[in-house]
């Protein structure tokens, strides 16, 4: 009697058992961040070698699991609100460098549950360092990958050297009767309008700079600078054309000697003067027949600041945040892309490695070259569909039972054959 049926049944049991393990692995990882569901690929087994010219009616010898493939479709994004949590929307993998089971090098992950370690490195839960392109400080980034490290030390203060004021000065304002510098009257009574900015010295101390503007009644406004309530004797004038556009500016620096710090010279920028009759340039002072008001003002100084954390934008740019409100670019996260994701090898801990089948990693940045964008404060959920997995459980259970029935039937037939001799 041919025992092929029994062998086929055994192969079916083994294959279904292995497939059931795949389903169980999926269900177990339903809450694993960045996990990609697996599926078992069944292949038939021939009882003979394939030879040229043989009959197409070769007998089968059961079934085997030919491969276990992962499904790399996008998982849903789960908002966490944690600034170091990131997710990729689209193709690609974050790059993590370190050692896993004695293998040292780059590993690839979709699980963006990152943190800053004690040395400021951005790391995954197992301590692998996330790779990126370091910021050069001039808006460009290095050409090679390195570990992303936040400079957790304090940022040094920067003295104010330039300040910008954009405002409208009412052309119909009545010139004040009190003269500049009259010690018996206030600065406010000597002017029509004023602005206030906080500026910083070389030690990072804050100072209040008040600019007072006085209409002369001749298409000109004089300005006067006061620092911390004390007259700096820094003055100048702004002239305006008949259309209200700025046509000239004089005396555009403020000099101040703070106690214990280096003397300060602040260059004032009131905008770009134009020729008489020309239209005003955006961002310049104006003098129209409307109430005086400031539209914008800024200065380039700041106090010292302590590191307070990082932010990550949609292109993976990692920015250091400081308590003084400053932001400094640190790095841009590297994103790896492969010719065939199916060829990647699993390394555990939500990591993959490149193989000959996947091809080498093509390094780049988020939202470029077909790579996905980065979502900060979110993680990518597992793409396991529980409903599908439960259906697969039932299918594999039924198939397992059917294969066991094949074995018992073949056994009964063999027993009948043995009984013939009796």
Q: Can you describe what each PLM-predicted range is?
A:
Residues 4-7, 14, 59, 387, ...:
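Register-specific recognition of a single heptad position within extended alpha-helical repeats
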Residues 403:
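Acidic/polar, glycine-anchored loop/turn motif associated with catalytic or activation segments
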Residues 13-16, 20, 386, 393, ...:
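Amphipathic alpha-helical coiled-coil segments
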Residues 413-422:
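Structured functional modules or segments
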Residues 36-385, 390-392, 399:
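Small/polar low-complexity and glycine-rich loop motifs
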Residues 1-39:
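N-terminal intrinsically disordered, low-complexity, charge/repeat-rich segments that act as generic
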């Amino acid at each position: 009697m041919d025992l092929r049926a029994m062998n086929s049944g055994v192969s079916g049991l083994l294959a279904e058992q292995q497939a059931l393990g795949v389903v169980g692995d999926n269900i177990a990882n339903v809450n694993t961040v960045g996990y990609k569901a697996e599926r078992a690929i069944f292949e038939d087994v021939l009882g003979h070698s394939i030879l040229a010219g043989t009959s197409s009616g070769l007998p089968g010898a059961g079934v085997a699991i030919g491969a276990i493939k992962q499904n790399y479709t996008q998982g849903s994004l789960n908002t966490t609100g944690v600034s170091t949590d990131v997710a990729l929307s689209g193709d690609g993998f974050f790059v993590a460098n370190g050692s896993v089971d004695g293998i040292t090098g780059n590993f690839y992950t979709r699980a963006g549950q990152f943190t800053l370690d004690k040395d400021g490195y951005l790391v995954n839960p197992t301590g692998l360092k996330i790779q990126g392109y370091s910021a050069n400080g001039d808006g460009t980034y290095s050409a090679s990958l390195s570990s992303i490290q936040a400079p957790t030390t304090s940022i040094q203060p920067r003295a104010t050297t330039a300040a910008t004021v954009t405002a409208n000065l009412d052309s119909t304002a009545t010139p004040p009767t009190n003269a500049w510098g009259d010690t018996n009257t206030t600065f406010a009574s000597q002017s029509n309008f004023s602005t206030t900015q906080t500026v910083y010295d070389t030690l990072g101390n804050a100072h209040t700079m008040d600019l007072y503007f006085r209409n002369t009644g001749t298409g000109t406004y004089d300005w006067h600078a006061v620092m911390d309530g004390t007259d700096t004797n820094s003055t100048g004038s702004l002239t305006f054309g008949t259309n209200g556009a700025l046509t000239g500016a004089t005396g555009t620096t403020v000099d101040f000697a703070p106690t214990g710090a280096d003397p300060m010279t602040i260059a004032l920028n009131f905008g770009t003067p134009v020729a008489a009759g020309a239209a005003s340039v955006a961002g310049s002072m104006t003098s129209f027949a409307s109430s005086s008001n400031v539209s914008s003002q800024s200065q380039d100084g700041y106090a010292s600041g302590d590191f307070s954390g990082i932010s990550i934008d949609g292109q993976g740019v990692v920015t250091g945040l400081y308590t003084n409100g400053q932001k400094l670019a640190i790095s841009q996260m590297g994103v790896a892309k492969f010719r065939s994701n199916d060829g990647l090898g699993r390394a555990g801990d939500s990591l993959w490695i490149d193989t000959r089948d996947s091809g080498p990693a093509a390094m780049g940045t988020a939202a470029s070259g077909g790579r996905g964008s980065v979502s900060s404060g979110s993680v990518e959920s597992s793409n396991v569909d529980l409903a599908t997995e439960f259906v697969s459980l039932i299918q594999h259970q039924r198939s397992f039972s059917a294969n066991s029935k094949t074995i018992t039937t073949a056994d009964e037939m063999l027993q009948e054959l043995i009984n013939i001799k009796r």
